[in-house]
């Protein structure tokens, strides 16, 4: 049995699979995000650990014999989160998350100090990355900065709690700006530019490597054997790719999770920072990927549903679909948490345009869904400019539950999309696969097979044409407002 753990933004998810990749038990424990100031986004690392314990306890209750037979654990997690440990190996402050926008000035300073950083790190300097956050801390919380013994990423804090090992792997390290993507090693000049030393970073492994074994006290808690290994794992984008078999050149998918991504696997390192793409090491050796990253995805739908008092999202979507016979009369910029591709603007915010006294909640929700679709089309254009293609991307993540939304996105993109069986398993499933690879050393192709395609959803080209002028207006509205998003 193989256990996958995903430390997400909204929840910790744990999933147990057998030798045939059949899910035997799964559990979700919700998390909360704190925003103590505008553009700040933080979580307490101890909340991740508490949620992880509760999730595995739940698996143990569901299927005690299967959890007892666990042989390996794989880890996945939200990327970029600066998790700082002091001399006692306890967190010094809340972790600063991927969608935190406080370190914009520090990005400019880092670019000035290291003009070639984008080519080596595979991405333009962005405030959500780990490195500029440390420069911000050095300036604004010098007492905390001076006490830093170790910097970990979210899933790697859970690794430390599980096994006592301080390690990370290539796909998650990629999001720090401290990794040299081509050589898959730490970039000493980037580390020093942040006032840090190599000793403050964890050692690097591949996602399919073993980093340690489960602590005896935890093995006893869950009635596990005493030699359960911990695999390197991956950042959530890479583990999502492992989960849907996106490991060969050109394999890809669209993720509709809290954030959204268009992910395409690559056989080489192909940096395109000028297009605001992420060109990162994959979670398996000698593989990379290119990715357009949107900071907002299915979270926009949840935000709208919560705001409108709609507890049953499925029923809400059914009502929206029933009245949807044309593009919405209103537009929505889905930048509730800023945006990366194609704007690199952490200060951008959500906008409804065209509201009238006759606007109903279904029309507003349709606009929200279309806004995410338009943002995906905007981001996809950057992949196209980079020469990156994916013939039939599947859609994964929580948003993939809605066939209606997938069909809408296919219409907006003018591109067929695949619905996978088990598309909502997500990164935890990929983490479990990496656990298996670490234990068995099987060929990647034998383990990371693609899921069965439940349906290929073809675009309605008439509706695609109807969306063209709406998309153009969507772009014009952002361009008109972009300067207004800058804080006073």
PLM regions and their residue ranges:
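N-terminal glycine/serine-rich phosphate-binding loop of ATP-dependent small-molecule kinases
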Residues: 1-94, 119, 147, 219-220, ...
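Active-site core segments that coordinate phosphate-bearing ligands/cofactors
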Residues: 3-4, 104, 110-124, 129, ...
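Short, conserved phosphate/pyrophosphate- and ester-handling motifs at nucleotide-, phospho-/glycolipid
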Residues: 44, 100, 236
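Short beta-strand-loop/turn "lid" adjacent to the catalytic site in phosphate-handling enzymes
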Residues: 63-98, 123-128, 159-180, 203-206, ...
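Extracytoplasmic/secreted proteins and extracellular or luminal domains
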Residues: 63-66, 197, 386
């Amino acid at each position: 049995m193989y256990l996958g753990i995903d430390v997400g933004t909204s929840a910790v998810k744990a999933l147990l699979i057998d030798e045939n990749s059949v899910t035997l038990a799964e559990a979700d424990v919700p998390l909360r995000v704190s925003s103590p100031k505008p553009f700040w986004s933080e979580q307490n690392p101890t909340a991740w650990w508490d949620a992880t314990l509760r999730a595995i306890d739940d698996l143990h209750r569901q299927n005690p014999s299967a959890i007892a037979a666990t042989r390996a654990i794989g880890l996945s997690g939200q990327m970029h989160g600066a998790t700082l440990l002091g001399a006692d190996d306890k967190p010094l402050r809340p972790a600063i998350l991927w969608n935190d926008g406080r370190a914009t000035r520090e990005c400019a300073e880092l670019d000035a100090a290291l003009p070639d950083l984008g080519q080596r790190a595979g991405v333009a300097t962005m405030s959500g990355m780990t490195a500029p956050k440390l420069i911000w801390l050095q300036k604004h919380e010098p007492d905390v900065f001076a006490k830093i013994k170790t910097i970990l990423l979210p899933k790697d804090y859970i690794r430390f709690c599980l096994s006592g090992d301080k390690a990370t792997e290539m796909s998650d390290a990629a999001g720090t700006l401290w990794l040299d993507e081509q050589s898959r090693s730490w970039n000493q000049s980037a580390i020093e530019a942040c006032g840090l030393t190599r000793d403050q970073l964890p050692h690097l492994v591949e996602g399919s490597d073993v980093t340690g074994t489960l602590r005896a006290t935890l093995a006893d808690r869950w009635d596990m054997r005493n030699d359960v290994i911990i695999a390197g794992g991956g950042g959530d984008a890479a583990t999502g790719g492992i989960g849907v078999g996106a490991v060969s050149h050109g394999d890809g998918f669209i993720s509709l999770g809290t954030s959204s991504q268009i992910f395409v696997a690559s056989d080489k390192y192909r940096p395109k920072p000028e297009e605001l793409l992420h060109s990162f090491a994959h979670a398996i050796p000698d593989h990379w990927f290119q990715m357009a990253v949107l900071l907002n995805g299915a979270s926009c739908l949840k935000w709208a549903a919560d705001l409108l008092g709609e507890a049953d999202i499925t029923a809400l979507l059914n009502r929206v679909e029933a009245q949807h016979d044309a593009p919405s009369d209103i537009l929505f910029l889905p930048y509730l948490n800023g945006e990366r591709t194609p704007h690199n603007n952490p200060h951008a915010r959500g906008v409804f345009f065209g509201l009238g006294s006759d606007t109903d909640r279904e029309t507003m929700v349709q606009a929200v869904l279309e806004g995410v679709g338009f943002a995906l089309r905007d981001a996809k254009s950057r992949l196209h400019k980079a020469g990156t293609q994916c013939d039939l991307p599947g859609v994964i993540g929580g948003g993939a539950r809605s066939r209606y939304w997938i069909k809408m996105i296919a219409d907006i993109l003018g591109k067929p999309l695949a619905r996978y069986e088990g598309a909502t398993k997500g990164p935890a499933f990929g983490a479990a696969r990496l656990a298996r690879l670490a234990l068995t050393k099987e060929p990647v192709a034998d383990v990371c097979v693609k899921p069965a395609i439940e349906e290929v959803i073809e675009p309605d080209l008439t509706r695609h044409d109807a969306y063209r002028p709406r998309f153009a207006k969507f772009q014009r509205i952002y361009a008109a407002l972009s300067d207004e998003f800058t804080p006073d």
